[in-house]
UniProtKB/Swiss-Prot annotation:
Annotated InterPro entries: GINS_A, GINS_bundle-like_dom_sf, GINS_Psf3, GINS_Psf3_sf, PSF3_N
Top-level taxon of origin: Eukaryota
Encoding gene per record: PSF3
Presence of the UniProt keyword DNA repair in the record: no
Pfam families membership: PSF3_N, Sld5
Gene3D superfamilies per UniProt: 1.20.58.2050
Subcellular location: Nucleus
Protein name per the record: DNA replication complex GINS protein PSF3
Function of the protein: The GINS complex plays an essential role in the initiation of DNA replication.
GO biological process terms on file: mitotic DNA replication initiation
Amino acid sequence: MTSNYFDLDDILSDGEKIPCRFNITVPGLGYLEGNPGKSIAKDTKIELPLWLAEILAICELSEDSQQSFIDLSQPDFINYKVINAIKTNAVNIDLHSILTNYYKLSEKWASMFNDVELIEVVMQMLKERSFEINNYASNASKQINNNFIFSLDEFEKKLFKVTSDSNKQMRKWLKD
């Protein structure tokens, strides 16, 4: 998946740390673990930003080898507990506390690994949560459930704002 250079949410999601494991010993990269001047040993587990981890995971060590510099591990935001919680009750999930750019990073991860199941789960969650977002944005006169609003990730916050603004404009248009 290509990144959008001008999208701040895309830049922030590329900076999210992903768990990785080095397949070889690399001299001089000890600073990644807090050991400047040292090597990073084979089988070292470390978290790297997605933009770097993605490149190191696809770059092969040599033309003869199929092995890459690192292997990516499944991140916490898509572990089985989170996915099961989403399947159980997507509306009550606090996406913001899990990951502020949950949809962006899920999209990137699913694209990297062709993870159809993740795409389906996230799309179903978006449908369920969008219905609630629309309800809150449409009912300006009702007291807003702040807990739900605070649980929205950045994409959902934009969706809430657009929906709310659209509803205000429609009410204004109907009034005039």
